[in-house]
Amino acid sequence: MSRQSTLYSFFPKSPALSDANKASARASREGGRAAAAPGASPSPGGDAAWSEAGPGPRPLARSASPPKAKNLNGGLRRSVAPAAPTSCDFSPGDLVWAKMEGYPWWPCLVYNHPFDGTFIREKGKSVRVHVQFFDDSPTRGWVSKRLLKPYTGSKSKEAQKGGHFYSAKPEILRAMQRADEALNKDKIKRLELAVCDEPSEPEEEEEMEVGTTYVTDKSEEDNEIESEEEVQPKTQGSRRSSRQIKKRRVISDSESDIGGSDVEFKPDTKEEGSSDEISSGVGDSESEGLNSPVKVARKRKRMVTGNGSLKRKSSRKETPSATKQATSISSETKNTLRAFSAPQNSESQAHVSGGGDDSSRPTVWYHETLEWLKEEKRRDEHRRRPDHPDFDASTLYVPEDFLNSCTPGMRKWWQIKSQNFDLVICYKVGKFYELYHMDALIGVSELGLVFMKGNWAHSGFPEIAFGRYSDSLVQKGYKVARVEQTETPEMMEARCRKMAHISKYDRVVRREICRIITKGTQTYSVLEGDPSENYSKYLLSLKEKEEDSSGHTRAYGVCFVDTSLGKFFIGQFSDDRHCSRFRTLVAHYPPVQVLFEKGNLSKETKTILKSSLSCSLQEGLIPGSQFWDASKTLRTLLEEEYFREKLSDGIGVMLPQVLKGMTSESDSIGLTPGEKSELALSALGGCVFYLKKCLIDQELLSMANFEEYIPLDSDTVSTTRSGAIFTKAYQRMVLDAVTLNNLEIFLNGTNGSTEGTLLERVDTCHTPFGKRLLKQWLCAPLCNHYAINDRLDAIEDLMVVPDKISEVVELLKKLPDLERLLSKIHNVGSPLKSQNHPDSRAIMYEETTYSKKKIIDFLSALEGFKVMCKIIGIMEEVADGFKSKILKQVISLQTKNPEGRFPDLTVELNRWDTAFDHEKARKTGLITPKAGFDSDYDQALADIRENEQSLLEYLEKQRNRIGCRTIVYWGIGRNRYQLEIPENFTTRNLPEEYELKSTKKGCKRYWTKTIEKKLANLINAEERRDVSLKDCMRRLFYNFDKNYKDWQSAVECIAVLDVLLCLANYSRGGDGPMCRPVILLPEDTPPFLELKGSRHPCITKTFFGDDFIPNDILIGCEEEEQENGKAYCVLVTGPNMGGKSTLMRQAGLLAVMAQMGCYVPAEVCRLTPIDRVFTRLGASDRIMSGESTFFVELSETASILMHATAHSLVLVDELGRGTATFDGTAIANAVVKELAETIKCRTLFSTHYHSLVEDYSQNVAVRLGHMACMVENECEDPSQETITFLYKFIKGACPKSYGFNAARLANLPEEVIQKGHRKAREFEKMNQSLRLFREVCLASERSTVDAEAVHKLLTLIKEL
């Protein structure tokens, strides 16, 4: 194999920089500030953070600086006059979308450079435009013209969900808001917004873009050289030549790390100046043996674009000096580095010198040539093929002979990949995360990364960018594993010295998986980044068991958790053959990931997972070993002592109360599951196993935050006495998945967004935790009329104090997501995680950055709770005049009001204010506790002071004893406190206890046993201080978390206040009349619904710009003056497109709003509580479930007939249209009869079957109503008719459906409409003939024929 293929050829020695050169290089690097990328100000990371961390990957292309542009050191730097601007589609003052590497599209303003006076730069074929990013702290930069698009507003199609520029991130939404404001101004006014005029790092603010070829990991020296080259107009050849002369290290074009990627990293403050100074794994002993001070470091390979469009530059030639240095590496070092050499094969040789163009890239990647990796030959770790029923797709069998041929670093990668084949492995090498083989392909295609050269697919990104890139992969459905280096080279050497036999694979630093991230297990730690939305995402674990052989009933055990909050829900329930309760659960708590026991799911459950949860990740776990049974779950929870800290004061079994209630009463140690809890505990076991696999079990379970899940309809089934359920405070209205979708409460049926939904219309909450609570209230409105009226009282109380509300709203806007911050603080402070979690051993290059983020989060939480206290203070001033009990509870302090729920946080907040220097900690990332806060730290400091004082006193005694006042202490580290005595005094008789340690001209240095003892005590105290300081942040967060209940209670109170303010805001600002719902108990009156002058809450204007027409909806109202006024079923007819479906949705939504405790858009709203809303609206099939349109209709109807009670509200739209006319009519007739006469629930039933209307026209249980329309020129020719929809719901039946009017509006050909009309007339005559024949037959059977029967026969004859 060629010498060039081995790694040590890329590690030539370089003489150490002199102090002067180091200072010069540092000044050159730190002389300016890199232009921040958009969004970098609130969250450090990404490309901008590379510059902050040190010299990292930068674009090769540099722009020429303007003449005599000032650098940050105040001097003038050499520059070249800029080239003449090229033509551009944009001009100063234009608003654009700009795209930068690793960031979403961002709204920007084009404006002239503050020093150049130009907004365009041209270099070769590249044209860049100068922009300012709309951000909380405006930043500027140069962006390629091809990555700019005109900005047309946040309401444009491309900025909405599904559009090219759509983003749900709060910072981008704020940026779009600022851009919208600028869009309404002219260009001159817009340019006044260009406020970012601070100088940036010497014109290196051109951010890295997609597809850019760049060299990574430049050292201090390289940066210094590049800054000089940047301002010198030289040719490519001369620049390369110049750089070669100045470089102290040689960058080889062959791959440096494909085969031997095990170059290690050890952070060292002494070598902090260079961003690529990473250890090679060579121990200190080896380094000391080198001829000169050498820094062995790995150069990142030159990256090439995925499409290979950029040409490879000619290879550099080594200078004689460089060659000489390279050959002087010791043989010992070479032998060590050979462990990382690339494999010897023809393909490696062929591509080792390949360039970045298409011709140099392999047509087939190396991993694609491996026979055992091909799909048809792949096996799992147990050598089972994919067609085996127990095949484990998450593992891979890797032949042992292949592993033996790998380099140590790549062998470790394959070992990790073989156990986690379904994960994208982010493999830490130095300060970069590397992606290899199939993972590299994903990185290039999904993240826009670029391939490194060679026949192995290989890409990567810096440590600081992990949060951004991993989140991008996770949101696209991938599972990501973060593999960290958990051992330094020194630790590796110490380990190897203890081993009897050492192989080359042992001389590799340890790496461990520190975290597996999936959609359902995101905790948003400092490494993972911030959440992009406020709502919860659930991980659901599911266990199913059929309760009878027929399969008509089944039982479910469920456990679902929001990992960002650490809150678990666990429950067990029976379900029907349609899985109604399970469907409701996944609608209320939509999971993004589902775990289930392999081979245990029924066909119906699989259908739900395949259809309703098709976008969720689904993973089957092996029964027993992965999906635990109930007994193993309980045993593991107790053995792992997850709840030790939270339940340390508890008595008996160390389990949370919810879990303790699921154990057998006869088992005092809590290892036996309860009779009706086995499935629930088994589901928890599957969840715990997966969290354990993802390495977040300790941080989540240790919160002991469990809540039992009980289906909302559990009481409605068991209650027999009419209306008894409405006296229970916890009873809720049931809204199943079908109803939530049909009423468009959360998502619309058009594009799946929140546009036009009830949630969007009502939601004006200002806090993330308030938004989550509002969604829960919408899922489950109240049924207890006392609770409903109490919320309505709260809304009225708030509406009468608008001044106070304005103050509170402004404070609410300042609150961070405290609920998630509490979970983060707990995770950082958890002693369980700090003891044995791999992350506690990980070697992190950006540790200071992460520490700063943790401190910022902590301080943000403290500030948030201070703001909460201010809010309570404002509300307490007016609380005495409030009627609402719930409002008084959430705004009253527990210490002042016995019914108050808000904890008094004043003492705790004051304590944390004085605990440490906040500003210093924010800047340094280190926490130094003040006296009195940390007893261990205080004791260590006291011991240090005591020992130091004791040593000073001892020195004074020795001076007096020897008679020399010039005796001083000398030494550093563990050799401190040597008595330095002038030589002329040492000739006298010194005490025998004096032990000579060292000498120098003119004096000698001594130790005594007393000094050694006192020094040992001092060193011990210093070590205790350092240990205490190192663990200070964790212990500080842990102490804060001890009061979790108080902090969480405060969050819950403010969440309720935020939602009440939201409802008050809607109630006060609705379009048109708003009224307070009147809720009456069923004991006082039969069930009824009265809506007068009601409007659809989500539609204020029609599409034609007309005002929405209010309507009266009366069902079962006593005051209605007609014979069938108490009818519970209303048949709704009317023309097509006349508004029937809208009317029915309107009734359902207003009922939901009324019982949620909100004002409704109506003049009058009176009702008895509704226990459940059923809907059968729209017509669609379920392809994924294999269900036809008609089957879907009947399934939803069957659920209604099975579960509806007299207190339900049923909305059925055109049942029976999915089958033959007579079949559909018959089914609709039977359903109406069942609903009206048997169940007697409030029903709106729309239909176009006019025979159905005739059948029930005289039925006292059914009332008729229709959507009015006005017909002009009504005649036999439908083309001459003009139909005007009045959208008014009135009494009686509509004579026709006017379907041909809809056909004409849909632009059907006129001849088709005419033919259809003639055919319709034939059908009508045939139907009338049949009716006449039936009446004649009935009349002939009667003994006498009355006048009414004769009149009916004559009428039918006349119609014919």
From Swiss-Prot:
Changing K295R: In multiple colorectal adenoma. Changing S677T: Normal mismatch repair activity. Changing R1095H: In CRC and LYNCH5; uncertain significance; normal mismatch repair activity. Changing L435P: Decreased mismatch repair activity. GO terms for biological process: determination of adult lifespan; DNA repair; intrinsic apoptotic signaling pathway; intrinsic apoptotic signaling pathway in response to DNA damage; isotype switching; meiotic mismatch repair; mismatch repair; negative regulation of DNA recombination. Residues 198-209, 219-230 have a biased composition (Acidic residues). The modification Phosphothreonine is found at T269, T488, T1010. Changing E619D: In CRC; uncertain significance. Residues 320-351 have a biased composition (Polar residues). Changing R901H: In CRC and ENDMC; uncertain significance. Changing R976H: In CRC; uncertain significance; sporadic; normal mismatch repair activity. Changing K728T: In LYNCH5; uncertain significance; no impairment of heterodimerization with MSH2; normal mismatch repair activity. Residues 33-51 have a biased composition (Low complexity). One of its GO terms (cellular component) is chromatin. Residues 92-154 form the PWWP domain. ATP binds at G1134, P1135, N1136, M1137, G1138, G1139, K1140, S1141. Residues 1-84, 195-362 are annotated as: Disordered. Its main location: nucleus. Changing P1087T: In CRC and LYNCH5; uncertain significance. Residues 240-249 have a biased composition (Basic residues). Keywords: Acetylation, ATP-binding, Chromosome, Disease variant, DNA damage, DNA repair, DNA-binding, Hereditary nonpolyposis colorectal cancer, Host-virus interaction, Nucleotide-binding, Nucleus, Phosphoprotein. The N-terminus is blocked. Component of the post-replicative DNA mismatch repair system (MMR). Heterodimerizes with MSH2 to form MutS alpha, which binds to DNA mismatches thereby initiating DNA repair. When bound, MutS alpha bends the DNA helix and shields approximately 20 base pairs, and recognizes single base mismatches and dinucleotide insertion-deletion loops (IDL) in the DNA. After mismatch binding, forms a ternary complex with the MutL alpha heterodimer, which is thought to be responsible for directing the downstream MMR events, including strand discrimination, excision, and resynthesis. Belongs to the DNA mismatch repair MutS family. This is DNA mismatch repair protein Msh6. It comes from Homo sapiens (Human).
